[in-house]
């Protein structure tokens, strides 16, 4: 086998499908780990939340990964603390085959003098794949903000956007102004489901964003899209938004993420996979391989596991 061919197979880690109903080896692109006792804490977790108000560490996640055929994981930082960028790298360093990379968080620092030195230091580790931006954006869309995004692209890193703080139209403008930057919107663009047809204005903004070729969409936190919990587990409740995402982004720009352990508030990991497969399996095994594996590797570009 040539060196180039070996590299490609190693990078994508493709697993042949023995039969039509088998999953490809999964790269789950949205898993959170946290130590609830760390000084910065996680302000979005309520004290009385019996599901999430505890630590979720690699040992908790690894058993789930083994059970469900997850060959790779992208860990997304759960909070906005700067030290947690390094903490996530450190806590997953023991198992680089599973923990392919880290998406940190620079929500409070991007566009300030503190961004560049810390970001460049983190980029010395090839498993640092980029960062997520969340929170309020209005005061941040400055020349310095865009300069930091261009530096991010120059370093070959990507940016996840948690919508809500950043509106879809803002991300569209960012994608236009920094076309070399790889952008991934989380959780189907932050759509909120209530059993009614999707709002026409939101659909228009979503489609406009999808026209930017450097923007990808994460099919993640499906159960969390519902305003009222527990969320329905019938695929019919999600077909409209999944049809929209598939038509808008196409088969090469959709990426799977579970949002574990936040999903535990509604359903277990098996239910997340079952729901996602219920929709995408009918599109054929080639599409499933892209959604669950190839697109993640192509977007995040994690180092080849050894």
How would you name each of these model-derived features?
Residues 35-36, 82-85, 111, 192-193, ...:
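Short catalytic/ligand-binding loop motif for oxyanion handling, primarily in non-cytosolic enzymes
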Residues 60, 87-90, 117, 121, ...:
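Alpha-helical elements of Rossmann-like donor-binding domains used by nucleotide-donor carbohydrate transfer enzymes
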Residues 4, 19-29, 52-72, 243-244, ...:
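Mid-to-C-terminal alpha-helical segments outside catalytic/metal-binding sites
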Residues 138-255, 284, 305:
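Catalytic pocket-lining loop regions of alpha/beta-barrel enzymes
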Residues 31, 78, 188, 258-260:
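Active-site metal-binding loops of divalent metal-dependent hydrolases
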Residues 21-155, 161, 209, 236, ...:
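Mid-domain alpha/beta scaffold segments of enzyme catalytic cores
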Residues 11-20:
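Hydrophobic h-region of N-terminal signal peptides that target proteins for export
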Residues 1-9:
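Bacterial N-terminal signal peptides that target proteins for export
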